[in-house]
Amino acid sequence: MEIRAAEISKVIKDQIASFGTEAQVSEVGSVLSVGDGIARIHGLDKVQAGEMVEFSNGVKGMALNLEADNVGVVIFGSDSEIKEGDVVKRTGTIVDVPVGKGLLGRVVDALGNPIDGKGPIVDATRQRVEVKAPGIIPRKSVHEPVQTGLKAIDALVPVGRGQRELIIGDRQTGKTAVAIDTFINQKAVNAGTDEGKKLYCIYVAVGQKRSTVAQIVRQLEENGAMEYSIVVAATASEPAPLQYLAPYTGATMGEFFRDNGMHAVIVYDDLSKQAVAYRQMSLLLRRPPGREAYPGDVFYLHSRLLERAAKMNDENGAGSLTALPIIETQAGDVSAYIPTNVISITDGQIFLETGLFYQGIRPAINVGLSVSRVGSSAQTKAMKKVAGSIKLELAQYREMAAFAQFGSDLDASTQKLLNRGARLTELLKQPQFSPLGFEEQTCVIFAGTQGYLDAVPVNRVTEYEAELLSFLRSQHADLLGLIRDTKDLGDEAKGKLVAALDAFAKQFA
């Protein structure tokens, strides 16, 4: 076989020409110490604040403290497999999670990984978790209602699409129940095809027991609400960094709907536990503690989260994200640090009281302390017309009831006020998982404020309401349809309603 020098030199020249000098450079560091969900890393000199890093066993972390000689990283997962000396890589990315309609009906963890055993998530894109809230110009004032299906809320503290309404109260006062009822009540609007009317639901569980989360998922499934809901769970047994991250993950999933001209409501249950998780992380990272040992930026923790709930203007798709954050108080102390912070950030609060709960007034809403800073602009015209007087009557009733305990000889007008107030209070009670449409609420509250209940004994008010609703549904469905379609209680509807109530009064005895 003949060897030609020219051919050999050509092969060598070709190889030299195609020789790549680019080496794969990735900046790495090594673990100095690890424990309690925090790792100290040596190296990674060019890492950026908030950047994701990856440990040698595949667990991800986020760089939060950039110090002169080391980097403080919070670990999104178990730290038991990580040991001193392990290699840590920069990823060059910021925490992102899957978003989109493919998440509806699913239960995911704080990083968006499915934990419900239903396989991988399809039809989803990825979006960054930490984004700036919309500015002032792209927003619009809140004007469409979120129908919670609870008379006490829809009549007295209405919530609008794009509002942030705090639900605050002690443990076991029914805070989560209010949120779950709101989800269940969206079944009717979500059954339609109009994306402008639908309201998708996101539930973020922070530091809850796993059994509690499983129970909530079961309740949503049994009531047919899971198909338009997403559950993000960072339970009590998960590391603090995941409990800190979960609300932002939920907000990112909600922003997908908001920015695409759709509507979503998100419940953070609860932000007290997120603040505790953040305090734990901050103290372990050796950040200086402030009041109640919370770090100085705990206000910013919640404000940047809740500012992402907004109503967008028509040029930006007219979508909305409504936030219902939950705060748990200790012995009714709303003047503690975290409750006052969140009250000042939100557009109103629904205040639930243990005393009312044990008296059997459920939902246990303290009507005097609960406010909505959006007010009647988030109500339908029909509800606005009937709910205006109920607020005043209940306020007068509370004032009088305090005095009436001392005096026995009350004049007729005071007695009438007390009788009416007792019946209205009874009327606002509602069992769990039985939300009402606004047209039914309108009729019931109209009956209460127009004196139809004055002759009914207090202990029969609930019975009166149930029978009235079945009477209206069976014999006056056209009236309910008229109120539902016009969203108003015009002269025609009012005349029909008065006639129906008069007819019902004769048969209810």
Curated annotation (Swiss-Prot):
SUPFAM superfamilies according to UniProt: C-terminal domain of alpha and beta subunits of F1 ATP synthase (SSF47917), N-terminal domain of alpha and beta subunits of F1 ATP synthase (SSF50615), P-loop containing nucleoside triphosphate hydrolases (SSF52540)
Subcellular location: Cell inner membrane
An example Gene Ontology molecular-function term: ATP binding
Residues bound to ATP: G169, D170, R171, Q172, T173, G174, K175, T176
Enzyme Commission (EC) number: 7.1.2.2
InterPro entries named in the record: ATP_synth_asu-like_sf, ATP_synth_asu_C, ATP_synth_asu_C_sf, ATP_synth_F1_a_nt-bd_dom, ATP_synth_F1_asu, ATPase_a/bsu_AS, ATPase_F1/V1/A1_a/bsu_N, ATPase_F1/V1/A1_a/bsu_N_sf
Primary role: Produces ATP from ADP in the presence of a proton gradient across the membrane. The alpha chain is a regulatory subunit.
Name of the protein this chain belongs to: ATP synthase subunit alpha
Lineage, broadest ranks: Bacteria, Pseudomonadati, Pseudomonadota, Alphaproteobacteria, Sphingomonadales
